[in-house]
Amino acid sequence: MRKAVKINGVAAVAGAVVATVVLAGGPATGQQDATAAGPANEAFAAAAAEFDVPRDLVVAVGYGETHLDGHGGKPSQDNGFGVMHLVSNPKRHTLEQAADLTGAPAHALKTDLATNIRGGAAVLRALADEHGLDAADRTRLGAWYPVVAAYSGATDDRVAKMYADTVYDLLGNGVRANARGEDVVVAGQFVRPEQGRFASVRALDDVSGDVHAMDYPNSIWNPAHSANYSVGRSSAITTVVIHVTQGSYAGTISWFQNPDSQVSAHYVVRSADGEITHMVADADTAWHARSGNPYSIGIEHEGFVDDPSWFTDAMYRSSAALTTWLCDTYGIPKDRSGIVGHNEVPGNDHTDPGPHWDWDYYIQLVNGG
């Protein structure tokens, strides 16, 4: 049985409960050493120096995207690669941009740790130039806020702001992560983000105005693009399908809002604090499980199937509360006959939620445990 672990003092950051985590409940202790021995630390230091990007910022962006896990060069849901999540899809081309900026081949940018980090730093610097940051500006972590928001690739300013806030919360709380067996540390530090135009952008979790729950009361309504789901249903709702995003929370929301993605889910759950974004009304058919779409509700969980650090207790509990509500609302059995993994839906070739998802603990929570 999985023991409950309380996550204290971390909001809107990619916290976790194993060794490859932000230090929940407080910042990373001690001073970070940009010259620490090891290929990952050396790569971050070298890339930061080459492109005049703060080393801690590069680490925080990478951690927010992937927990510094390149996943062996395998693509994310929106076809992003490596610890810096360099993307190649119809709407975003940071992988190709990194290749142009660094002269590195795409294959190396996808699979080689140092090359990928160098590519991410190059893209950040190019965005800084676009935003008019001069040499003095680039020395101030706070000045990079609009650049980080742009790195998200989000078309919704609220999602871009959430992405940047996550990175700056990581800088404030500190990071201690494991990259291929090597500790990478960012000491917690006070940073005042210079938000620029994002200062007037309403936060995604601001429930005033039209940001409200559509179905589940404890969720934020931020709809997917209408090209990515079908209005109405051809079958009654009988099943909850558990997914893992293979990407970040902000990235997944942005991907579902991209009309080229042709994919969506009803709900997305954040790793750090269990925040839930509702993207397709329950009465409509999200495109998440092929043959299972007509009769199911899809819940995406931020993270990657091969990295258990994303599956926090806050995520489990928040998702389980949502599933309990869905089961009570639609008469779905609160067991493994009514709550299934994406891999268990007929006609699917996906593997999520994967071997690290604790089904016993989750079903216990759904049933009030």
Language model regions located:
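Extracellular/periplasmic catalytic domains that process cell-envelope and extracellular macromolecules
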Residues: 50-54, 77, 116, 140-142, ...
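Catalytic glycan-binding domains that act on GlcNAc-containing polysaccharides
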Residues: 34-170
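N-terminal catalytic cores of peptidoglycan-degrading enzymes
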Residues: 37, 43, 184-290
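Structural recognition of the beta-strand scaffold that forms the well-ordered cores
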Residues: 57-60, 85, 239-244, 264-270, ...
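Short, solvent-exposed loop/turn and secondary-structure capping segments
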Residues: 71-77, 160-164, 182, 252-255, ...
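Basic/polar, cationic surfaces and motifs that engage anionic cell-wall
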Residues: 1, 5, 163-220, 308-369
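Secretory targeting and sorting signals
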Residues: 1-32
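Solvent-exposed loop/turn segments at secondary-structure junctions
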Residues: 64-69, 89-94, 127-130, 154-158, ...
